[in-house]
C-alpha cells in the first residue's frame, strides 16, 4: 500500500505535523522507533523565547510566532482528545545575581514586540517569596509560558490516533531508498514502506539517515514534589536562572533542569550532573532542598552547529526536513507543523523557511577534500569526484534548483538564438519582463510560447517600473501570467524599481516599500538592488526570498565593480545571494561564485555575444567552476614565495 505521506519520527514534532496534515485531508503514517524515548519526554515544556534571549532574528520570529499559536493549538488538541496538555501562561521570572544585571536587556530594547520588565531586589523578592538571598533583581517575561511536555506528547499521540493517522511504534527506519532525486521508499525492520511524500522528523537520530549536522546533546533532569504539608503552591511561575531552570506544575511537582552534555548517546544520569542541577536550583530557590525527589531522567536533544532547526526541502523533491530543534522542540511544534503542512499540501513556502534550510551549513564549509583516495585516479588520469551531496540544489523559497545560473530573454537577435542559449546554459530559471510581454514589445513577441515552461521556472520581473506602486501592480500581472502558462503555484517575482533612465540603478526606498507589500501578499520576492549591505539585510528581515545585488550597471559588461560590498552581503545573508547585472565574461561569473554567491543572473553577456549559445554554455561551466572553487577553499595568499619542492637535501 502507498500512503500519501510517511513521517519518520514520532516525537512531538513528527506527531504535530501528522495531526496538522491529517486535518488537511491527507493520509498520514507515522513511523516511531520508541515513543517513550522521544526528546519531548526529557524536556521541561518551557515556552521561553524571551527568557532564552534568542539573538538570531529569524529564530526569534519563528519562536514568537509559535508561542502565539499555543493557546488555540492546545485548545484544539484538548477538544479532539478530552485530555489536558497542561498549557499554563504563567510567565517566566529570570532572577539574576550580582554582576548579571545586564542579562535580558536585549529583550527590553526590542521595540516593544515582546515586553520584558526589570524588577528591583525588593520587588522581585516580594513578587516571588523564597528566592535566594543573593538574588539582586530579575526580569519578568509575561508572555512566556509553559506546557506539560509529557502530557503534550500523550495528547498528540491520542489526537493523531483519533483522527485516523496510522501510528506505528517500534519501527526502526534503516535507510531511505532514493532514485533520481526522489525517495521511493523507506527500508524498515519490518520491510519497505512507500509513500508519495516523506517527512524526516527523527530529532537527534537524523544523522543516521542523512548526512545532516545533527548531533545528540544529552540533558539530565529531575523532579521534586511539594510536600502535602505546604498548603499552597509556593511557585506559580517558571524560574529561569543561569544554566538552571525550575518549572512548577499545577500537580505540585517541580521540574529541575537541565544539563547540556556533548557526550553522544551515552545514557543514564550521573552524580556530577545531578549535583550540578541541585546546587544551581537550591541557590536560586533554597527551600527545594527540603522537597522529596520523585525521579531522575535524561534525554537527547537534536543540536545543530548553529543551534537552529533544519526545516523545509531536502536534496530529494519529495522529502521534507523537520529536525534539529535542540532546546526549542516543544515551543516550535505548532509553527513547524503549520509551515510544513503549508509547504506539502498548499505548496506555500513561508519566506522564513529559507533561514533554516540545510544548505546553510554548506556555506560555512571552507574546504572540501577533492582527491582523498586512490579510487579517484584511473590509468594515471584524475577522475572528477562528485560534488558534495548536500550542495546539489539551490533552494529559493522552498523550491529546489540544480542549476545556479539564471538567464533572461531580452536583447537576443532572434527567438531561435534565445531558445538555443537557454538550452545551452542549463538554466532552470528564466526571467521575463512582464510589461514587455504584455505589450508585445519588439523582441518579445511570442516569447511566452517560445520556451518549455514545464521544464523552466518562470521568474516574472517588473522591469520598466519606476515606482513601488507600479512594480506591485506588474508583479500581480506576472503571477497571473505564470498561471496561464501552467505554473499555478509560481509566486516568484524579480522586483525591479528603477526610476533612473541613464544608469538604471534601482531605487532602494521604492524597492523596500514594494518588497514589504509583496511579501504580505504571499510573493517570493527576489529584489534587484545596489550592492548595499544594509539594504540587503532590511530586505531579508522583511521576508524576501533572496537578494540580488548588482555587480555593475545593467547591460554594461563592466564585471565585478562592487566586490567588497557583495562579500559583506554574502557573509551576513541567511537567504540566497544572487549576483545580478554587469557580468560580461565567464571569468567574472566564476569570480562572483568564488566569492560565495549562491547563484548568478546573466542575460546581456549571453544575448549580445557573437555566438550566444556558446557563451551560454561557457557561463554555465564558469558558474559550476566558481562554485566548486568556493567549496574547495583557495590557498592562502602569502607575501613571499614558497617552493613547491624541498629546498634542502638537493643533489650536489
Swiss-Prot record:
FAD binds at residues 5-19, 44-46, 173, 325-331. It catalyses: glycine + O2 + H2O = glyoxylate + H2O2 + NH4(+); [ThiS sulfur-carrier protein]-C-terminal-Gly-aminoethanethioate + 2-iminoacetate + 1-deoxy-D-xylulose 5-phosphate = [ThiS sulfur-carrier protein]-C-terminal Gly-Gly + 2-[(2R,5Z)-2-carboxy-4-methylthiazol-5(2H)-ylidene]ethyl phosphate + 2 H2O + H(+). Residues 393-652 are annotated as: ThiG. SUPFAM superfamilies: FAD-linked reductases, C-terminal domain (SSF54373), FAD/NAD(P)-binding domain (SSF51905), ThiG-like (SSF110399). One of its GO terms (cellular component) is cytoplasm. Its cofactor is FAD. Its main location: cytoplasm. It is found in: Cytoplasm. Signal peptide: none annotated. Its EC number is 1.4.3.19, 2.8.1.10. Pathway: Cofactor biosynthesis; thiamine diphosphate biosynthesis. GO terms for biological process: thiamine diphosphate biosynthetic process. 1-deoxy-D-xylulose 5-phosphate binds at residues 555, 581-582, 603-604. Keywords: Cytoplasm, FAD, Flavoprotein, Multifunctional enzyme, Oxidoreductase, Schiff base, Thiamine biosynthesis, Transferase. InterPro entries: Aldolase_TIM, FAD-dep_OxRdtase, FAD/NAD-bd_sf, Gly_oxidase_ThiO, Thiazole_synthase_ThiG, ThiG. Glycine binds at residues 52, 301, 327. GO terms for molecular function: flavin adenine dinucleotide binding; glycine oxidase activity; thiazole synthase activity. The keyword Transmembrane helix does not apply. In the N-terminal section; belongs to the DAO family. ThiO subfamily. In the C-terminal section; belongs to the ThiG family. Interacts with ThiH and ThiS. Catalyzes the FAD-dependent oxidative deamination of glycine. Is essential for thiamine biosynthesis since the oxidation of glycine catalyzed by ThiO generates the glycine imine intermediate (dehydroglycine) required for the biosynthesis of the thiazole ring of thiamine pyrophosphate. This is Bifunctional protein ThiO/ThiG.
Amino acid at each position: 500500500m502507498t500512503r500519501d505521506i510517511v513521517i519518520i519520527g514520532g516525537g512531538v514534532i513528527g506527531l504535530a505535523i501528522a495531526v496538522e496534515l491529517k486535518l488537511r485531508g491527507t493520509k498520514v503514517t507515522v513511523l516511531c522507533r520508541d515513543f517513550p524515548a522521544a526528546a519531548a519526554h526529557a524536556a521541561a515544556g518551557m515556552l521561553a523565547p524571551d527568557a532564552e534571549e534568542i539573538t538570531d532574528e529569524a529564530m526569534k520570529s519563528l519562536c514568537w510566532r509559535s508561542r502565539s499559536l499555543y493557546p488555540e493549538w492546545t485548545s484544539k488538541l484538548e477538544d479532539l482528545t478530552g485530555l489536558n496538555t497542561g498549557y499554563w501562561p504563567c510567565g517566566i521570572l529570570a532572577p539574576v545575581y550580582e554582576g548579571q544585571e545586564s542579562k535580558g536587556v536585549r529583550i527590553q530594547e526590542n521595540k516593544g514586540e515582546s515586553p520584558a520588565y526589570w524588577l528591583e531586589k525588593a520587588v522581585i523578592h516580594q513578587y516571588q517569596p523564597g528566592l535566594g538571598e543573593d538574588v539582586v533583581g530579575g526580569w519578568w517575561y509575561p508572555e512566556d509560558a509553559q506546557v506539560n511536555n509529557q502530557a503534550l506528547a500523550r495528547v498528540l499521540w491520542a489526537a493523531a490516533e483519533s483522527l485516523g493517522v496510522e501510528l506505528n511504534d517500534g519501527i526502526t527506519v534503516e535507510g531511505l531508498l532514493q532514485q533520481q532525486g526522489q525517495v521511493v521508499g523507506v527500508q524498515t525492520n519490518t520491510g519497505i514502506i512507500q509513500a508519495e511524500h516523506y517527512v524526516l522528523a527523527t530529532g537527534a537520530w537524523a544523522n543516521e539517515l542523512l548526512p545532516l549536522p545533527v548531533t545528540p546533546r544529552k540533558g539530565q533532569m529531575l523532579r521534586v514534589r511539594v510536600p502535602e504539608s505546604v498548603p499552597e503552591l509556593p511557585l506559580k511561575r517558571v524560574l529561569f536562572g543561569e544554566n538552571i531552570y525550575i518549572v512548577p506544575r499545577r500537580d505540585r511537582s517541580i521540574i529541575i533542569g537541565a544539563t547540556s552534555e556533548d557526550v553522544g548517546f551515552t545514557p543514564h544520569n550521573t552524580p556530577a550532573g545531578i549535583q550540578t542541577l541541585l546546587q544551581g536550583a537550591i541557590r536560586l530557590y533554597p527551600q527545594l532542598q527540603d522537597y522529596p525527589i520523585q525521579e531522575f531522567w535524561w534525554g537527547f536533544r537534536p543540536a545543530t552547529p548553529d543551534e537552529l532547526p533544519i526545516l523545509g526541502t531536502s536534496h530529494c523533491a519529495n522529502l521534507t526536513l523537520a529536525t534539529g530543534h535542540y532546546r526549542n522542540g516543544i515551543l516550535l511544534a505548532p509553527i513547524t507543523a503549520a509551515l510544513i503542512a503549508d509547504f506539502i499540501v498548499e505548496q506555500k513556502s513561508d519566506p522564513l523557511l529559507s533561514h533554516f534550510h540545510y544548505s546553510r551549513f554548506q556555506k560555512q564549509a571552507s574546504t572540501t577534500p577533492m582527491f582523498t583516495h586512490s579510487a579517484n585516479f584511473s590509468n594515471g588520469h584524475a577522475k572528477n569526484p562528485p560534488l558534495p551531496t548536500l550542495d546539489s540544489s539551490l533552494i529559493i523559497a522552498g523550491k529546489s534548483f540544480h542549476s545556479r545560473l539564471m538567464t533572461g530573454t531580452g536583447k537576443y537577435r532572434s527567438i531561435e538564438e534565445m531558445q538555443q542559449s537557454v538550452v545551452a546554459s542549463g538554466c532552470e530559471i528564466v526571467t521575463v519582463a512582464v510589461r514587455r510581454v504584455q505589450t508585445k514589445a519588439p523582441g518579445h513577441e511570442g516569447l511566452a510560447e517560445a520556451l518549455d515552461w514545464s521544464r523552466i521556472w518562470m521568474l516574472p520581473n517588473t522591469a520598466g517600473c519606476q515606482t513601488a506602486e507600479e512594480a506591485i501592480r506588474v508583479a500581480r500581472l506576472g503571477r497571473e501570467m505564470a498561471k496561464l502558462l501552467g505554473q499555478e503555484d509560481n509566486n516568484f517575482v524579480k522586483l525591479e524599481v528603477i526610476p533612473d533612465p541613464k544608469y538604471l540603478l534601482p531605487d532602494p526606498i521604492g524597492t523596500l516599500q514594494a518588497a514589504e507589500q509583496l511579501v504580505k501578499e504571499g510573493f517570493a520576492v527576489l529584489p534587484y538592488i545596489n550592492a548595499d549591505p544594509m539594504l540587503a539585510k532590511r530586505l531579508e528581515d522583511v521576508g524576501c526570498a533572496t537578494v540580488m545585488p548588482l555587480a555593475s550597471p545593467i547591460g554594461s559588461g563592466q564585471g565585478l565593480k562592487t566586490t567588497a560590498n557583495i562579500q559583506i552581503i554574502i557573509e551576513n545573508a541567511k537567504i540566497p545571494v544572487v549576483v545580478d547585472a554587469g557580468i560580461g565574461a565567464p571569468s567574472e561569473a566564476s569570480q562572483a561564485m568564488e566569492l560565495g554567491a549562491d547563484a548568478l543572473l546573466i542575460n546581456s553577456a549571453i544575448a549580445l555575444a557573437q555566438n550566444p549559445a556558446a557563451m551560454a554554455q561557457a557561463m554555465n561551466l564558469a558558474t559550476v567552476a566558481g562554485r566548486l572553487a568556493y567549496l574547495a577553499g583557495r590557498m592562502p595568499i602569502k607575501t613571499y614565495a614558497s617552493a613547491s619542492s624541498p629546498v634542502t637535501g638537493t643533489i650536489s
